[in-house]
From Swiss-Prot:
Cofactor note (record): Binds 1 zinc or iron ion per subunit.
InterPro entries in the cross-refs: Amidohydro-rel, HutI, Metal-dep_hydrolase_composite, Metal_Hydrolase
Lineage of source species: Bacteria, Pseudomonadati, Pseudomonadota, Gammaproteobacteria, Aeromonadales
Any Pfam family matching the protein: Amidohydro_1
Provenance organism: Aeromonas salmonicida (strain A449)
Function: Catalyzes the hydrolytic cleavage of the carbon-nitrogen bond in imidazolone-5-propanoate to yield N-formimidoyl-L-glutamate. It is the third step in the universal histidine degradation pathway.
Name this polypeptide is given: Imidazolonepropionase
Main location: cytoplasm
Named cofactor requirement(s): Zn(2+); Fe(3+)
Binding-site residues, N-formimidoyl-L-glutamate: Y147, N322, G324
Gene Ontology CC entries for this record: cytoplasm
Residues holding Zn(2+): H75, H77, H245, D320
UniProt keyword list: Cytoplasm, Histidine metabolism, Hydrolase, Iron, Metal-binding, Zinc
Compartments reported by the entry: Cytoplasm
Length: 411
């Protein structure tokens, strides 16, 4: 018996690993292997042809089924209260968003509902959404604040996010997005809101250990380039990496600014230009594509996928779960849309929810690949080929889900 396997607490025999290793072609597929876990990490990956018994006490034969890294949803807004279904109905009837917003709808309706909700209520609502992601193979999820827009309510959202990671079998990375919108209290003085973010909210979130990163919605209906830089400088003072909602509706040059700050990722990017692409390529910043928002908003301008590909910018894919522009709680659907709407290949979509998604969260040394030494977050699927994960939607193909070496689903 292989010595490394004998030291493992659990062994999965006869898995066909799609390793997603960058040094291997496409999905990084290997012949059937034994995968052993020790102390929450992948401790051994041994070809079945090299094995001889006896096996460790805790093993199971997966009969050649496909194994992949756990899926990573690296951009979500899944903590919120209230519903925007009525707004959706009005928009389908042709009512402009500006009119809906004037009547109290839009993002500020979500802000009011989220402020009014207790931590327990927000936890219950968000847990239901996360459980849907868990069922389709998500093992790590990023969750943003941004619907509180006061010091206490932003911290409330981040506390809920931390609780979700403690209570449910999923890794949670938190992002402070106080610069999501200007709250009504600061409507006539948005610069003062930016000062509040920089001088009060970022310090409080950092000192409480509630934020893993800081994000800004840099857009003509959001925050200017100068305001974004101000928030990034404050984040940098507290050692927090930055991210950005960039170039979704127009091109303000936010991606180049974010790249100058060594951002983990910039997201949306429908209006990204060549200068921005080169800045991302130069600094190795991840471009996160959000096809569900593109679909839901009926956008027509596509992100420059071919140019990103040519420049070797790493592309991630995420669900962007939120009540206003992407009420679609499915990373698998986002993978499909990334292929059908944006022109990614199924390989690129899979890399986008594993290896590159891990990089978008600063977790590329621990997550996103099947290799010895990585955290033991992996999935076993009842499907013939990894492309099925982007192709076939709505069918439960998940056989085994492992997080930190602990099995949380076995069919």
């Amino acid at each position: 018996m292989n010595k490394e396997l004998l030291n493992c607490e659990r062994v999965w025999l006869n898995v066909t690993p799609a390793t997603l290793r960058p040094d291997l072609a496409d999905y990084g597929l290997l012949e059937p292997h034994a995968l052993g876990v020790h102390e929450g990490k992948i401790h051994a990956l041994v070809p079945m042809q090299d094995l001889k018994g006896p096996y460790p006490a805790h093993w199971q034969d997966m009969k050649g089924k496909l194994a992949t890294p756990g899926l990573i949803d690296c951009h979500t807004h899944l903590i919120f209260a209230g519903s925007r279904a009525e707004e959706f109905e009005l928009r389908q009837k042709g009512v402009p968003y500006a009119e809906i917003a004037r009547k109290g709808g839009g993002i500020l309706s979500t802000v009011r509902a989220t402020r009014a909700a207790s931590e327990e209520q927000l936890f219950t609502l968000a847990a239901a959404r996360i459980k849907s992601l868990i069922r389709e193979g998500v093992t790590t999820v990023e969750i943003k604040s941004g619907y509180g827009l006061t010091l206490e309510d932003e911290l409330k959202m981040l506390r809920v996010a931390r609780r979700l990671g403690e209570a449910l079998p999923i890794r949670v990375k938190t992002t402070l997005l106080a610069a999501h919108a200007v709250p009504p209290e600061y409507r006539d003085d948005p610069d003062s809101w930016v000062e509040t973010i920089c001088q009060e909210i970022i310090p409080a979130a950092a000192e409480a250990g509630l934020a893993d990163a800081v994000d800004v919605f840099c857009e003509h209906i959001g925050f200017s380039l100068a305001q974004t830089e101000q928030v990034y400088l404050a984040a940098d003072q507290y050692g927090l990496p930055v991210k950005g909602h960039m170039e979704q509706l127009s091109n303000l040059g936010g991606s180049a600014l974010a790249a100058n700050f060594g951002a983990l990722s910039v997201d949306h990017l429908e209006h990204l230009d060549q200068e921005g692409i080169q800045a991302l390529a130069h600094r190795g910043v991840v471009a996160t594509l959000l096809p569900t928002a593109f679909y839901f908003l009926k956008e027509t301008k596509l992100p420059p996928v071919a140019a990103l590909r040519k420049a070797h910018v790493p592309m991630a894919v995420s669900s962007d779960i939120n009540p206003g522009t992407a009420p679609i709680v499915s990373l698998r659907m986002a993978m499909n849309m990334a292929c059908t709407l944006f022109g990614l290949t199924p390989v690129e979509a899979m890399v986008g929810v594993t290896r590159n998604a891990a990089r978008a969260l600063g977790e590329q040394e621990r997550l996103g690949q099947l290799r010895v030494g990585m955290l033991a977050d992996f999935l076993v699927w009842n499907c013939a080929h990894p492309a099925e994960l982007s192709y076939l939607i709505g069918v439960d193909q998940l056989v085994s889900r492992v997080v930190n070496g602990e099995e949380t689903l076995h069919g």
